[in-house]
């Protein structure tokens, strides 16, 4: 009886590990599928005085920001988080 209980416990642990692996793969697939949607991101532009060095020269800096599902592109930096319809996105600005 003990042997059956031990074998059942081992089987449950193996099934749980496999289920977690499948969930990670599903999450990765979802992330990859959504990364194609980055081109449809919401664009936000801010016009105003930029760095203090620019303020002294009288010019204005302009930032364009996107609410991205995936990571920011090479030219962008993570500037915060934005929320659209209760869902959180990365705020990436250049």
From Swiss-Prot:
Entry keywords, A to Z: Antibiotic, Antimicrobial, Cytoplasmic vesicle, Defensin, Disulfide bond, Fungicide, Glycoprotein, Immunity, Innate immunity, Secreted, Signal
S-S bonds: 65-93, 67-82, 72-92
Compartment(s) of residence: Secreted; Cytoplasmic vesicle, Secretory vesicle
PROSITE patterns linked: DEFENSIN
PTM note: Glycosylated.
Function: Host-defense peptide that maintains sterility in the urogenital system. Has antimicrobial activity against a wide range of bacteria, including Gram-negative E.coli, P.aeruginosa and S.typhimurium, and Gram-positive E.aerogenes, S.aureus, B.cereus, E.faecium and L.monocytogenes. Confers resistance to intestinal infection by S.typhimurium. Exhibits antimicrobial activity against enteric commensal bacteria such as B.adolescentis, L.acidophilus, B.breve, L.fermentum, B.longum and S.thermophilus. Binds to bacterial membranes and causes membrane disintegration.
PANTHER family in the cross-refs: ALPHA-DEFENSIN 1 (PTHR11876), DEFENSIN ALPHA 5 (PTHR11876:SF6)
Assembly information from the UniProt record: Homodimer. Homotetramer. Interacts with B.antracis lef/lethal factor.
Name of the protein this chain belongs to: Defensin alpha 5
Native source organism of the sequence: Pan troglodytes (Chimpanzee)
Origin organism lineage: Eukaryota, Metazoa, Chordata, Craniata, Vertebrata
